[in-house]
Amino acid sequence: MFRKEADLGKTVKIVGKQKMEVLAERIMDTYGNAVLRLAYTYVHNMSDAEDILQETLIRYLEHRPVFAGENHEKAWIFRVAANLSKNKIAYNKIRQADQLEDQLIAQEREDLTFVWDAVKRLPESYREAIHLYYYEGFPTAQIAEILGKKESSVRSDLRRGREKLSEVLREEYDFE
C-alpha cells in the first residue's frame, strides 16, 4: 500500500511532535524541580520561577543541543535557567523603577493640583505670565514676545501674580 506525500508529511509531524513531547517529559522529570528551585532562589516568586522553568524547557527544545554526557546536559540547562533568572531580575528592577517613577510623577501632580487650581483664579495677565514661566519654562524675554508686552511688564505681572497667588493660598489652604 502506497501513501501520498501529504499523508507521509503528517505522519512525520506526528512522530516529531511525539518525540518532542517525550523529550520534554524526560527533561521535566529529570530536572524540572531542581530548575524550579534554582529559579526561585533568584526571583523569590513562584510564578516567575515557573515562567523561567517553561522558558528553559522551550530553549532546550528549540536548540536540542547534543551533549557528551548527562552532566553536560544538566550544566547547560542550569546555566540557561540561571541566565533567564538574572534577566528576569533585571527586567523586574527596571519595571519597578518605571512604576515608582510614574507613581512619584502622579503624586507630584496631585500635590500641585491645588496650586494650579489657585492659579486659574488669578486675573488673566497674571495667569498667563505664571503659566508660561513656571509650567512651560519660558524666560521673561520670550514671554514678552509671546504676549506682545514689554519684558518689564511681564516681570511685574509675575511679581503681582505671585503675591496674589500667595494671598489665595493663605486664605484657602492656611499657608504661611
Segments from the language model and where they lie:
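Structural recognition of an alpha-helix C-terminal capping motif at a helix-to-coil junction
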Residues: 37, 51-58, 71-83
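A short, charge-rich alpha-helical start-of-domain segment used by transcription regulators
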Residues: 3, 12-37, 50
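DNA-recognition helix of helix-turn-helix
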Residues: 82, 147-171
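A short pre-motif secondary-structure segment
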Residues: 129-133
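Sigma70-family region 2
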Residues: 44, 55-72, 91-92
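Amphipathic, Lys/Arg- and hydrophobic-enriched alpha-helical face
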Residues: 27-46, 63, 119
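Arg/Lys-rich amphipathic alpha helix in sigma70-family domain 2
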Residues: 68, 78-98, 108, 160
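Internal acidic/polar
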Residues: 87, 94-120, 139
